[in-house]
């Protein structure tokens, strides 16, 4: 687990999942607000 290669891959995976999580939260917030204000 202390290898630099697997470390780099883990960091990239975490960053990608973080971006997807933020995108999902953003989409849910837009849908939620449009549902409320309708």
UniProtKB/Swiss-Prot annotation:
GO terms for biological process: photosynthesis. The keyword rRNA-binding does not apply. InterPro entries: PSII_PsbL, PSII_PsbL_sf. It is a single-pass membrane protein. The keyword Transmembrane helix applies. The chain crosses the membrane at residues 17-37. It holds the Pfam family PsbL. SUPFAM superfamilies: Photosystem II reaction center protein L, PsbL. Keywords: Chloroplast, Membrane, Photosynthesis, Photosystem II, Plastid, Reaction center, Thylakoid, Transmembrane, Transmembrane helix. It is found in: Plastid, Chloroplast thylakoid membrane. GO terms for cellular component: chloroplast thylakoid membrane; photosystem II reaction center. PSII is composed of 1 copy each of membrane proteins PsbA, PsbB, PsbC, PsbD, PsbE, PsbF, PsbH, PsbI, PsbJ, PsbK, PsbL, PsbM, PsbT, PsbY, PsbZ, Psb30/Ycf12, at least 3 peripheral proteins of the oxygen-evolving complex and a large number of cofactors. It forms dimeric complexes. Belongs to the PsbL family. One of the components of the core complex of photosystem II (PSII). PSII is a light-driven water:plastoquinone oxidoreductase that uses light energy to abstract electrons from H(2)O, generating O(2) and a proton gradient subsequently used for ATP formation. It consists of a core antenna complex that captures photons, and an electron transfer chain that converts photonic excitation into a charge separation. This subunit is found at the monomer-monomer interface and is required for correct PSII assembly and/or dimerization. This is Photosystem II reaction center protein L. It comes from Euglena gracilis.
């Amino acid at each position: 687990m202390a290898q630099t290669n697997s470390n780099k891959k883990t960091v990239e995976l975490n960053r990608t999942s973080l971006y997807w999580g933020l995108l999902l939260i953003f989409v849910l917030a837009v849908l939620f607000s449009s549902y409320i204000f309708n």
